[in-house]
Each structure stands twice: as structure tokens, then as C-alpha cells.
Curated annotation (Swiss-Prot):
The keyword Nucleus does not apply. This is BLOC-1-related complex subunit 7. It holds the Pfam family BORCS7. As part of a BORC-like complex may play a role in lysosomes movement and localization at the cell periphery. Associated with the cytosolic face of lysosomes, this complex may couple lysosomes to microtubule plus-end-directed kinesin motor. Keywords: Lysosome, Membrane. It comes from Xenopus tropicalis. Transmembrane segments: none annotated.
Amino acid sequence: MTASTEGQARYGQSVKGLLTEKVSTCGADVIALTKQVLKGSHSSELLGQAARNMVMQEDSILHSEDSLRKMAIITTHLQYQQEAIQKNVEQSSNLQDQLKHLLK
């Protein structure tokens, strides 16, 4: 072989080595990119699930607030009824005393 042929062979081997290195680097970059895309997709799914959970919790909170308002109204009505019953008991005691006094 001549010197130029040997130089061309070495140059060809060098180019092949560089190409092999570049191909493996590109492959690693593609794998890293794929992992990042999958991670981003998973993050999006998690955000969507979190949003759905928040909506469900908001509905529960609104329902709880409504229930508390209703319970406050019921409590007020029960207090009025208790006061009316107390007045009736007092009047009943007075009537019993008056009846006892009349029957004597």
C-alpha cells in the first residue's frame, strides 16, 4: 500500500469511529428525551387528577356549608320550642297551684 492509501484508510477508520460515537450520543439523547416526555406526560396526568380531586372537595365543602346552615336553622327552631315548653311548664305549675288552692 502506498502512503496515500494508508492515510485514506486511517481517515476512513477515524470517520467511522466519530460516526459511531455520534450515533451512540444521539441514541442516548433520544432516550433522555423520551424519558423527559414521559415524565412530563405523567406530571400532566397528576395535575389533572389533582384538579379533579379539588373539584370534588369543593363540592363536599359547599354541601357541608349548606348542611351547617340548615343545622343552625334547626337549632334556632329547637331553642324556640324549648322556650315555649318551659313557659308551658311554668304555666302548668301555676295552674296546678291555682287548682290546688281552689280545691281546698
